[in-house]
């Protein structure tokens, strides 16, 4: 793993530890991302709540989160960054077992560390998730197939838009 990826993950872990306990109900911390886009560093805090979040919600949450980031010592950020508090959008990441359990019945995209039947990316309806295995109904050309995917082989999962 390259040095920049390790540093980004350390920053994400530190920010998560500080920010997560401060997120009030009914909000949910969905994800934190720290990345360089062009010459700018962006710290994205993805928040959601039942019914979705509004622009006012993101402004209120920014007022909670921004001062907390200033309290982290020593300062973990190597350069100036922009704080972005936003909704995870339609294709929200599914990073926890709880998020996957809540996504049962929905259309998802799953990328794997290791291929199953020569396929590393599955997109289909999440039929079940028991905490260890995802069961997905996907389309192989014109035929529906079902695949069982061990949770530990999942590299990334997210909701997907069905076209």
UniProtKB/Swiss-Prot annotation:
NCBIfam families xrefs: PRK00092.1-2
Protein name (record): Ribosome maturation factor RimP
Gene Ontology biological-process annotations: ribosomal small subunit assembly; translation
Chief site of localization: cytoplasm
UniProt keyword terms in alphabetical order: Cytoplasm, Ribosome biogenesis
Role this protein plays: Required for maturation of 30S ribosomal subunits.
InterPro entries linked: Ribosome_maturation_RimP (IPR003728), RimP_C (IPR028998), RimP_C_sf (IPR036847), RimP_N (IPR028989), RimP_N_sf (IPR035956)
Any one cellular-component term (Gene Ontology): cytosol
Organism expressing this protein natively: Streptococcus thermophilus (strain ATCC BAA-250 / LMG 18311)
Intracellular or extracellular location(s): Cytoplasm
Pfam families: DUF150_C, RimP_N
